[in-house]
Curated annotation (Swiss-Prot):
Oligomer status and interactors: Monomer. Associates with F-actin. Interacts with aarA, ctxA, ctxB and rgaA.
Protein localization: Cytoplasm, Cell cortex; Cell junction
Listed GO MF terms: actin filament binding; alpha-catenin binding; beta-catenin binding
Family, per entry: Belongs to the vinculin/alpha-catenin family.
Native source organism of the sequence: Dictyostelium discoideum
Gene Ontology BP term (one): actomyosin structure organization
Function: Involved in cell adhesion. Thought to play an important role in cytokinesis B, probably by providing substrate adhesion and traction forces. Required to organize and polarize the tip epithelium during cytokinesis. Required for the normal distribution of myosin in the tip epithelium. Involved in the localization of ctxA, ctxB, dcsA, exoc6 and rgaA. Thought to form a complex with ctxA, ctxB, and rgaA which regulates myosin accumulation to the apical plasma membrane.
Gene, per the UniProt record: ctnnA
The protein's name in its UniProt record: Probable vinculin
Xref: Pfam families: Talin_IBS2B, Vinculin
Coiled coil spans: 585-679
Keyword Nucleotidyltransferase appears in the UniProt entry: no
Length: 842
């Protein structure tokens, strides 16, 4: 598959270079049909091979695979049509440009086919890991030796398959550290499993021995932790292997067991919080409190595991903030319960308890969403929750529900503060000046509105007939929701709500499965939450659809919205029927089917609504225009205020400026002269991205400066590495000048040179007697080849899109990765050569 991918990448690169060269030189373009026919054959063969593997693909990805395969064939057909058009009218540049577009689409879809298959394999592997973990938990519950032997056999079978598949995944990693880590964890799983099973047998032989039970529990905990570490490392390998690729769909990563536990514990905690007042009335308050504390502690402990693993510093900061909030609220809840338990008629105590219950529920929901979301989605989810609280406050006041209004209002100040804090954290990840300005303005607006909302809400609650207060509150809430909408984009809101809808649907099914006297009450509440989330998701998607100008893409988004709209009443009806009679198997079957389709529709909507590069550019353009307008207004005001003073001292200022310019010019000329003396052979290009790429090339040159360049394999390898550094520097210069052909040519030269480097390095490795040094050389050989192929694909596919921040980041990351691989390859080859010279001659 990789060979086919590289072959198609080379063919696409050649086609792009040929067409670009013809356009630049204004020459007659030759017949591309024969070459396109070869591309078409390779593409169709790959698509057919992918379709034959449908039976082996997880059902979640079958639709994506079939759709991508179909698009791939269509793109190949379109490329052929454009090639024929270009042959019939060789001076017409339009079909040539259409051919470039179709060729790039082919390459993107080929990459997607590979990724879809990999995702499916990972999901199967993770499911095996979770089944093995469930078996480990069941072993801890068994005290009959025969039953234990049966369960151990099942677990061993799962773990053997898990280790075998893990080793296969490690072989596909481009990162030596992750590959080694996965192998070590797989070994640890085997060791801990044997120890745990032996301990479980000891317990069966001596069931009353508490020491043995304690040892079994300790080993079980370590084994489950190791299995979860294995799942997390598999996720990291996939993310590391695909960080250079723009996915056409939003990949929904598999969840670790710690992430699953956060979600499950949140559902238990929220269920207990909702029924807490009834439990207190029935005299079960202390027992309910214990359940709440246990669920909160379980959610917090697993969330801490997720936070400690998190490699994104901004997301980690957000997670720790959410964890601290739930930690703070749990003892507050217990304290608020005590006066109610002592005096159930204390209205003030009851009101305070309900406020703390509401805040704790919100904190738990937010944490459950955050562990499986990106920083932008965490902020969007917080904004959705805050906007819903504001709407609920207004509705409660309008309906005269003073008690509920007071409960919601008690939570809103801290909710606004929390949202502002999360938005400020998100600012750390944003470099676009327009977007930063927009978010800062929205934060300032929320800070201004917060005291006004509290004041007007208190007035309206105290006097429902105070129409002025209600009018002002409505206006303030409208402004606050607008500010919230300026912090998070609609597509981020849709993705955040997709996570919440999935979590709530899973909790609903779990609630029905567990039954109990409060099942219907809990189920109705889940149904309300789900319906509200779907409504908000549709509203956000419709708002974004109105901004889309591409008719085909707009239709795709609207079709996805319509599909979710149709399913919503079906879902609510299925929930109603199942809650009315949980034992009705047909009703349950319908509910499971509708839940599955709603999840798919919600996920599909969150995928198709993700913005294209053109849409992101348009958003950026509008923000920049707004900044320019504001800056122009501010400058005009400043000029009007300073005009009189400037006229009075204009002569003195002009003289100062003239002298300063002369002095500055002298300094500039002197600095330029000094710079010319020290200047490298290549001029450092302008722009942070181009400088970063040039810097990566300079790192290679500096690292090799003192190396010997002779006719030995190591000397030849160093000379070839010099050539790679030279071509990387040229890519930076070509990118600065917008030279597409130059970038592609330089990338291809790097790929060709890397192959020569690999030849020399493998020669050194073959003659090295130290296995560890030999493996290091071969590892960095593979890394260099992977990075050069990714660079070649990136320059071919994204060559016209380098104003896109994502493309810029990918170019810099790829250049730095290639630089590091080349430097480490030379170092490891040098070490291997030294080891070789120490071998005595025969």
């Amino acid at each position: 598959m990789d060979e086919v991918l590289e072959m198609i990448a080379d063919a696409v690169s050649s086609l792009v270079v040929a067409i670009t060269d013809s356009e630049e030189k204004n020459t007659l373009f030759g017949d591309m049909v024969p070459g396109v026919e070869l591309i078409q054959q390779a593409v169709n063969g790959m698509a057919e091979a992918a379709e034959e593997t449908v039976s082996l693909i997880d059902e979640e990805f079958i639709g994506q695979l079939e759709s991508t395969s179909k698009q791939l064939k269509n793109s190949a057909g379109q490329l052929y049509v454009h090639a024929v058009r270009a042959r019939e009218d060789p001076w017409n540049r339009v079909p040539q440009k259409d051919a470039i577009k179709a060729a790039k689409q082919i390459l993107q879809n080929v990459v997607l086919l590979v990724l879809i298959e990999e995702q499916s394999n990972i999901k199967v592997l993770v499911n095996i890991a979770k089944k093995a973990a469930e078996g480990v938990r069941r072993i801890d519950e068994i005290e009959n030796i025969k039953q234990l032997d049966v369960m151990i056999g099942d677990v061993n079978q799962l773990q053997n398959e898990l280790v075998k598949r893990s080793q296969r995944r490690s072989e596909g990693s481009h990162n030596p550290e992750l590959r080694s880590k996965l192998e070590d964890i797989a070994t640890m799983v085997n060791i801990l499993s044997e120890q745990h099973q032996a301990s479980a047998r000891d317990v069966c032989r001596n069931p009353r021995e508490e020491t043995l039970r304690s040892k079994r529990s300790e080993l079980s905990s370590k084994l489950l932790s190791a299995i979860d570490d294995l799942i997390y490392t598999i996720k990291l390998i996939f993310e590391n292997n695909t960080k250079f690729v723009d996915l056409a769909f939003k990949w929904k990563p598999v969840r670790t067991m710690a992430e699953d536990e956060v979600t499950r514990a949140s559902a238990v905690l929220i269920d207990n919080l909702r029924t807490l007042p009834k439990s207190i009335e029935a005299g079960n308050g202390p027992a309910a409190a214990r359940e709440i504390v246990n669920a909160a502690n379980l959610q917090i402990s697993n969330a801490i595991i997720v936070a400690n693993r998190c490699q994104d510093p901004v997301k980690k900061k957000m997670l720790l903030k959410q964890i601290e909030e739930l930690k703070k609220l749990t003892p507050m809840l217990i304290s608020a319960m005590k006066p109610v338990l002592e005096n159930p008629n204390d209205q003030e105590a009851q009101k305070h308890l309900e406020s703390v219950i509401y805040s704790t529920q919100k904190a738990s929901e937010a944490l459950a969403t955050a562990v499986v979301s990106s920083p932008a989605e965490i902020v969007a989810a917080s904004g959705v929750s805050l906007a819903r609280d504001l709407d609920s406050l207004e509705e409660a006041i309008a309906s005269g529900d003073k008690k509920r209004a007071q409960v919601i209002l008690s939570h809103i100040p801290s909710a606004i503060d929390k949202h502002i804090e999360l938005a400020n954290a998100l600012l750390e990840t944003i470099t676009d000046p327009g977007q930063r300005h927009q978010i800062k303005q929205s934060i300032e607006r929320l800070q201004t509105l917060k005291p006004r909302i509290i004041e007007n809400a208190n007035r309206a609650i105290a006097n429902p007939n105070d129409h002025e207060a209600r009018k002002n509150l409505s206006s303030d809430i409208k402004e606050a929701k607008k500010a919230i909408g300026q912090i998070s984009q609609p597509y981020e809101v849709v993705s955040a709500l997709n996570t919440k809808i999935h979590n709530d649907l899973d909790s609903l099914i779990k609630c029905i499965d567990e039954g109990g006297p409060d099942m219907q009450v809990k189920g109705v509440q889940y149904a309300k939450d789900i319906a509200n989330s779907i409504k908000k998701q549709i509203e956000a998607a419709e708002a974004y659809a109105q901004t889309i100008t591409d008719p085909d893409r707009k239709k795709q988004v609207l079709d996805s919205i319509e599909q979710l709209k149709k399913l919503t009443p079906q879902l609510l009806e299925a929930i109603r029927a199942c809650l009315a009679n949980p034992d009705d198997k047909e009703a349950r079957k319908r509910l499971d089917d509708v839940v599955r389709r709603v999840k798919e529709a919600s996920s599909n909507l969150s995928q198709v609504i993700q913005p294209t590069a053109d849409e992101l550019k348009e958003e950026k353009r509008k923000r920049n225009e707004e900044i320019a307008r504001i800056e122009a207004e501010e400058k005009a005001k400043a000029r009007a205020l300073l005009k009189a003073a400037e006229l009075a001292r204009i002569e003195a200022e002009e003289e100062k400026k003239r002298l300063a310019i002369i002095e500055e010019e002298k300094k500039r000329l002197a600095a330029e002269e000094e710079e010319r003396k020290r200047a490298p052979k290549l001029v450092v290009p302008e722009g942070p991205v181009n400088k970063a790429v040039f810097g990566a090339a300079a790192d290679v040159a500096q690292a090799l400066e003192s190396k010997v360049r002779d006719g030995t394999p190591l000397g030849i390898l160093v000379q070839l590495s010099d050539e790679i550094a030279q071509q990387m520097a040229l890519i930076a210069s070509f990118a600065m000048n917008g030279d597409v052909k130059g970038m592609i040519t330089a990338a291809r030269k790097i790929a060709d040179t890397i192959k020569q480097v690999q030849t020399q390095a493998k020669h050194i490795a073959d003659n090295c007697t130290d296995p560890r040094l030999k493996q290091n050389v071969l590892t960095y050989c593979d890394c260099g080849g992977n990075f050069s192929t990714q660079l070649k694909i990136l320059c071919a596919v994204k060559s016209n899109d380098f104003n896109d921040p994502t493309a810029e980041e990918q170019l810099v990351t790829c250049a730095k990765g290639l630089s590091g691989a080349v430097i480490n390859l030379v170092k490891s080859s040098e070490a291997a050569s030294i080891k070789q010279r120490k071998v005595p001659q025969q």
